[in-house]
Amino acid sequence: MQHVSSSQSSQRHVQWPGACPGAGEEQPACSQPSLPLTLPSPSHQLQQLMVRGGPAGGQNMNVDLQGVGPGLQGSPQVTLAPLPLPSPTSPGFQFSAQPRRFEHGSPSYIQVTSPLSQQVQTQSPTQPSPGPGQALQNVRAGAPGPGLGLCSSSPTGDFVDASVLVRQISLSPSSGGHFVFQDGSGLTQIAQGAQVQLQHPGTPITVRERRPSQPHTQSGGTIHHLGPQSPAAAGGAGLQPLASPSHITTANLPPQISSIIQGQLVQQQQVLQGPPLPRPLGFERTPGVLLPGAGGAAGFGMTSPPPPTSPSRTAVPPGLSSLPLTSVGNTGMKKVPKKLEEIPPASPEMAQMRKQCLDYHHQEMQALKEVFKEYLIELFFLQHFQGNMMDFLAFKERLYGPLQAYLRQNDLDIEEEEEEHFEVINDEVKVVARKHGQPGTPVAIATQLPPRTSAAFPAQQQPLQQIHMGTPVPGDVNSIKMEASKRQ
């Protein structure tokens, strides 16, 4: 039997549906559709209250719950007051019956969805309390202390149906006597951080609104921000991570809002994940961090391996590590020139084409040599004479001995000429004999010396020429070198 009394002293007796067949005189009262109260079996110790007809504006309504079940002790009273919400009795109000949804978010929490059009009265901090009103007592399994936690949180924090209130009742044994009411949709008009005391003969219950400072729709996270207790009772301790981090409950919302939530979640996952990487990234769940003014969402971090501190620690692919390292040292060695043999042409046409190609490349090479020679003359003029460029044309026309030696020294074909001259020197070996028939020292004499050698030893050419011409010399080659050094 339930007794419902309003402030206008109007009493209506409503009997439970299970007790209607037993009492014949109370059957007309059961058929009144004004205040149907439906509750599940008492073994659940959870009640769902659905009020279709609210009180008049500016009035409070007291509901006495008697004999509900072992979950409520005594006869507590619940005060329902009107809020600035669309009234269920208005013609524009549409109520959609939502099915009850029971989920296991964490081992110590039970989520109960009840379509309430009127919420539990939480008074504005600017209005005085009308007096000793409601008292919510021990709705916790088997513990004597008050441990009721009601949370109304929206997945997006902005969109929520006015007729849906998600209540999450904490069943943890640790309780601090706090009544935490989270609301991200603006259903409850309470200032930031404001506290409203609900008077009760027993332990006082504190109503506090916590608004999240940032949206909690993270990739891979969950929207059910459950904590073992309120931040004041927890003392800033880390919150337990939820058991199922891969889903977001949108079954209690209209399909339009749920599709918006899923679309935003997919976009955020794409932004956070980015393009597919060739190597896997390590995902780890960091312990819950309590943000100021937030509901304690479990952090979700994405860690990547730190950069190597030294080049030796850099990971080398196995294909590169097997390459031989000796090939780098072979590049510094001088390659032995190979003698190229001329391949006879297959036809006269091929011989003609080959000749034309050789002539063309020879002309290009001669043009490059002429340009290089011009640059060498200009460089010699600027380095040795340091003159004016106006005199450069006159300097280039006249023949200058050091300039010719400088050009021969920096000639592009000097290496080929040196090789040819050294071959000539090795071929010509002559024996110098003295007048008295004593054998002399064999000396290698060349008819033409390389330009570098002739420029480096200009004074030694005369003794060598005298030896070559057969003039008598009083000593051997060593004495000739000593005399040449004395003359210098």
UniProtKB/Swiss-Prot annotation:
Residues 1-43, 66-100, 113-144, 201-250, 271-336 are annotated as: Disordered. Signal peptide: none annotated. Transmembrane segments: none annotated. Pfam families: EP400_N (PF15790). InterPro entries: EP400_N. Residues 1-15, 31-43, 113-126, 226-245 have a biased composition (Low complexity). This is Putative EP400-like protein. It comes from Homo sapiens.
